[in-house]
């Protein structure tokens, strides 16, 4: 009997040690070299029918990207003037320096007006706001299409509403639009929440849903009027099933940077984490990882360290000058205005003359630009939930440039390095990136997006055999 008891105790000890060894493994934190480029494809060209009347439906489109597992397809938003949902197939991927050799996706579902033209109905009472609404993100959830919208220039902080639901089969059922709805309550010092939540969305992996308490993350960062949005990546948890049932929809801020808490850098800071030209337009939370990957663009600036400039742009490096230098030149030349590209400057404007080979407009510049990734540890979001840190205390564990083909620093279309959105297929661990204005092979004036695909090259944590165990030998 004693031998049997010793044997049972030994087995229990081994099992406990084995289980402890499993629990000691954390999911991976994804690094740059674990995103393996698999190729790209073109979107359908020309007019795609349905609700679209424009000759090139998807030209200057490609935003709000999301993956639809039911059809193994992608859904995106068409050009800004129409703002229609379009569903396309995922063809065989090709790696080539020649765009014409890429495969072209097929149309799965014709363009549909899923928001019933109400993208700008973002005011607290549901009325339209000035300057229009910009399609933010799309997400397939519980056989519905979840969408969001944000105000392009919301100086008055009027964008309170942001999200809606629509039919996933709009071509047969109609839009079945229901919205717009408010998500979450504003942070302290913020008047309205639309500028923080009205953009990209991402599914939370099952193991993290139980930890964070929400199935979906939504956010937005780096928009005009920076005081009403996040100064960098931003993430709020919410449950889409609450849309239309609870006002506002309960949401928790896990990550955000306000003007009072600019952890990644002030608006005019020299930084590769955040600066005046930063845009954050996509989020992926890969299964089997502890990583949140945010996608967007960054300004590298003349130093390569993220310096920026405000004023008109010039394509001539020799014309770039600070306000003080412009004033000195004007004074030395008898009051003659200084030439900054096509702009004449007196030196009293309070602006610099900014070198930018792809943008001559008056505004913020950070040339050259880069496609960008911010990688965060989900355990930091959990710490926010537990109350041990604030949403603005978190910093990325890594940032890196995302090298996409078919772009050039001097090309007027791809030089700004804009990413329209990101989507994710957990069954294949593939990430889809919509590259803005990259396909101008058929029309130089109406370029199309190109879809690039990365495969996440990591596996779930491997369970190792327990180490340093003492096994008792049972002798009779």
Model-identified regions with their sequence ranges:
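N-terminal secretory signal peptides that target proteins for export/translocation
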Residues: 1-7
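Bacterial N-terminal signal peptides
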Residues: 9-21
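Sequence/structural signature of beta-propeller domains
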Residues: 26-459
């Amino acid at each position: 009997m004693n031998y049997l008891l010793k044997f049972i105790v030994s087995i229990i000890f081994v099992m406990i040690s084995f289980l402890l060894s499993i629990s000691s493994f954390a999911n991976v934190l994804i690094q740059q070299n674990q995103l393996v480029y698999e190729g790209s494809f073109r979107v359908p060209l020309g007019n795609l029918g349905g609700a679209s009347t424009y000759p090139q439906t998807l030209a200057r489109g490609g935003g709000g990207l999301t993956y639809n597992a039911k059809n193994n397809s992608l859904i995106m938003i068409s050009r800004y003037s129409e703002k229609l949902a379009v569903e396309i197939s995922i063809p065989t991927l090709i790696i080539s320096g020649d765009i014409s050799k890429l495969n072209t996706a097929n149309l799965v579902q014709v363009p549909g007006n899923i928001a019933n033209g109400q993208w700008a109905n973002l005011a607290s009472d549901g009325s339209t706001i000035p300057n229009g609404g910009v399609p933010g993100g799309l997400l397939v959830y519980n056989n519905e299409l979840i969408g969001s919208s944000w105000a392009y220039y919301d100086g008055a902080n009027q964008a309170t509403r942001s999200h809606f639901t629509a039919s996933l089969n709009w071509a047969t059922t109609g839009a079945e639009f229901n919205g717009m709805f408010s998500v979450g309550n504003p942070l302290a010092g913020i008047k309205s929440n639309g500028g923080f939540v009205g953009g990209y969305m991402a599914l939370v992996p099952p193991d993290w849903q139980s930890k964070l308490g929400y199935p979906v993350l939504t956010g937005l960062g780096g928009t005009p009027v920076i005081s009403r949005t996040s100064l960098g990546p931003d993430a709020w948890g919410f449950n889409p099933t609450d849309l239309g049932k609870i006002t506002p929809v309960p949401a928790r801020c896990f990550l955000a940077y306000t003007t009072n808490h600019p952890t990644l850098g002030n608006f005019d800071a020299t930084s590769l984490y955040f600066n005046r030209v930063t845009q954050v337009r996509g989020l992926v939370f890969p299964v089997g990882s502890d990583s949140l990957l945010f996608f967007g663009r960054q300004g590298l600036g003349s130093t390569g360290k993220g310096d920026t400039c405000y004023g008109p742009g010039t394509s001539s490096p020799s014309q770039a000058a600070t306000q003080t230098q412009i004033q000195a030149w004007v004074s030395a030349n008898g009051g003659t205005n200084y030439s900054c590209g096509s702009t004449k400057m007196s030196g009293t404007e309070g602006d610099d003359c900014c070198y930018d080979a792809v943008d001559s407009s008056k505004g913020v510049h950070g040339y050259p630009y880069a496609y960008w990734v911010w990688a965060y540890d989900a355990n930091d979001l959990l710490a926010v939930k537990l109350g041990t840190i604030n949403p603005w205390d978190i910093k990325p564990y890594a940032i890196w440039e995302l090298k996409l083909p078919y772009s050039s620093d001097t090309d007027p279309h791809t030089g700004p390095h804009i990413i329209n959105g990101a989507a994710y297929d957990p069954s294949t661990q593939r990430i889809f990136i919509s590259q803005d204005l990259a396909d101008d092979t058929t029309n130089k004036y109406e370029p199309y997006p190109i879809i690039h695909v990365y495969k996440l090259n990591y596996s779930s944590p491997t369970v190792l055999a327990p180490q340093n165990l003492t096994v008792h030998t049972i002798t009779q």
